[in-house]
């Protein structure tokens, strides 16, 4: 419906490329999205009208998985004030295919940022908040 109104641009928060890419490209309407660095988003930024993508690494859930595994195994990790852990992972932004490719190649199913080796560093009996925070900050 929004595309039928002939907008000059289209802004989406998640999955515009999944549902609207074909229609937006055919109509010549530039669009932006907050989504992941996926193959289809790469095609949209290279050959289509996707002009801005803010995304997270596909493996960004890795540290949360590590925190849960630690808690299950008896190492409940808290911050310095005794609160539940809160970590921030910034969005990566691509406005062209070259930048997109850099992020996509650095984190995909075959080569995740939070690989098994990385997760092994933050899962264990002696892991602390500082350890997990350092690993997340370095990625």
Description of each model-found segment:
Residues 1, 37-44, 56-75:
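Hydrophobic alpha-helical segments within soluble ligand-binding/sensing domains
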Residues 2, 24, 41, 99-107:
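Generic hydrophobic, helix-prone segments enriched in Leu/Val/Ile
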Residues 3, 27, 47-48, 75-80:
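Alpha-helix termini
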Residues 4-9:
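Short acidic/histidine-rich motifs immediately flanking catalytic phosphotransfer sites
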Residues 10-49, 53:
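Venus flytrap/periplasmic-binding-protein-like
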Residues 16-20, 41, 61-64, 99-100, ...:
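Stable alpha-helical elements in mature extracytoplasmic
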Residues 67-139:
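Hinge/cleft segment of the Venus flytrap/periplasmic-binding protein
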């Amino acid at each position: 419906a929004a595309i039928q109104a002939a907008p000059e641009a289209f802004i989406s928060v998640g999955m515009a490329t999944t549902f609207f890419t074909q229609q937006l490209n055919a109509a010549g309407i530039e669009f932006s999205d907050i989504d992941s660095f996926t193959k289809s988003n790469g095609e949209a930024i290279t050959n289509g009208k996707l002009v801005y993508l803010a995304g997270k690494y596909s493996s960004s859930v890795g540290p949360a998985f590590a925190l849960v595994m630690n808690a299950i195994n008896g190492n409940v990790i808290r911050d310095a004030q005794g609160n539940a852990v809160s970590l921030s992972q910034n969005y990566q932004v691509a406005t062209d295919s070259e930048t997109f490719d850099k992020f996509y190649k650095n984190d995909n199913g075959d080569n995740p940022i939070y690989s098994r080796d990385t997760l092994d560093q933050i899962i264990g009996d002696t892991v602390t908040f500082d350890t997990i925070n350092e690993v997340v900050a370095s990625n």
